[in-house]
Amino acid sequence: MINRLCKRLNQNIEVRQSLSSLRQEIKDSSKRELLLSWIHDGDLDLSVFLENEDAKTRKNAALLIGDLALSSESDAVFHAYQTEDTRFVKEAYLTALKSLNAAPYVDVFRKRYEELSLYEASDDEKKHVEHELHALSELINTIEPFKKHRFLGGRQTFHCIFRTNPLHPEITAALMEESSAASSKMGVRVKTNHLNRLLPIRTYNELLFQIPGMVSCKPDADVAASVIAGSNLMALLENTHEGDFPFYFRIGVKSHMALSERSKFAKKVASKLEELTAHKLRNSTSHYEFEIRMIEGKSGDYYLLVKLNTIVDRRFSYREEFIPTSIKPVNAALLVELAKDYMIPDAQILDPFCGVGTMLIERQKVVKGNTSYGIDHSPEAIKKAIYNTNLADQIVHYINKDCFTFTHDYPFDEIFTEMPYATGQKTEAEIREVYEKFFPFAKRVLGPEGTIIMYTRNREYVKQFAVKSNFRILKEIKITQRPESYLMILK
């Protein structure tokens, strides 16, 4: 197929379609190499099609050159961009140049961006001008990645939503010690002048901001952009960050619309917002500094929230290594907060299914233990646990073996663990067997007053097998609804 298409191009037969077909064919790496051999051997020159009288042919040729990353054609593509009169083709040249050597022309692109951002486009031109502006912005930042703004915070008043586990927002609210903190469906709402004091709390999933003047809007792209542009958003960005405009953003839409419709709607909002802010806010899907979340309500209107990616979350910076079944550190932190009244300071602690060490590390941050041991059958998990624990500046003794064969010279005070669960690697029957073995094992390694604090997705097995080894359930707390999971404390 590649040979046939190349011959057709050289014979000037259905050029536009042949270029388009080649773009599809080279998704296969072997076919890509075959096409490149035609070009490198001098048997095909794609640059000639940049001068074709048909605009769509020029567009397809530029995009194919970009797909192949033919840096040798950088000058030709740049020249074609500068001389192109058809607006919808100009975006294609810029897209191609992202994969080529466009650095020598960056000043030209900057000047073009400034000129185009001031240009009053007609209704017919508007869409294509917006596309070219967006492509210019992406290209400029590919050549010279922009310096991300640094969040300063300061004594501003922030209207925040700390998103949490939906069943336990009260845990995060209590840790805030803020009179305005109130639990809601989304987490904890709080109005605060002390944001920097709240950021280190370990039990929230993410932080969103409600911006005065942009609480909600009608389901219309122009209206949404007007509400956002007329709000306190620009002032907030300017007053809480080091550096000047522009700021880069993306729009996220959560609604009943199909994905393609959501994407179109988000692009319309973003484009209008760029226009209304004189391009002080610029849309980017790859290097954005903040997100505008548009969440459809029952009435059809949208609630508007902002996430600042300029706020660096260092709470779990130790957790660089993980495996597919690793518990999220924010979930481990929540388990610790829920169970801390049952944890003994200076205890001897064991996690027999330790994975990459997250449970033990998070426990130590809240209730200091004496000696901690982690066991896992996976050499990879143990290696990663050691790495993470060193980053956390903690000491845990890790052992790579089947925990049920583990013996120790003295008893432990506590087992704190996330129990295994059925996955593609473990069947339900195997999980049942783990629980059947676990409680006799726990009885053997724990002292007479020993405690089990476990996170489980198999509550029924706990109830079935715990009693056989004389363990009684002191407390059970539902952690997630779907799938059902529980924190269970036994003695």
Question: Which role does the model predict for each range below?
Answer:
Residues 1-9, 35-49, 70-82, 103-115, ...:
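Amphipathic alpha-helical scaffolding segments comprising HEAT/armadillo-like alpha-solenoid repeats
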Residues 236-324:
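Non-catalytic substrate-recognition/targeting regions of SAM-dependent transferases
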Residues 398-483:
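S-adenosylmethionine
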Residues 319-336:
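Conserved SAM-binding loop and adjacent beta-strand
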Residues 82, 98, 113-276:
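Non-catalytic nucleic-acid substrate-recognition regions in nucleic-acid-modifying enzymes
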Residues 332-410:
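Conserved S-adenosyl-L-methionine
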Residues 15-37, 59-68, 91-100, 127-136:
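Structural detector for internal amphipathic alpha-helices that build alpha-solenoid repeat scaffolds
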Residues 8-14, 48-56, 82-88, 115-120:
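Short coil turns that connect the paired helices of HEAT/ARM alpha-solenoid repeats
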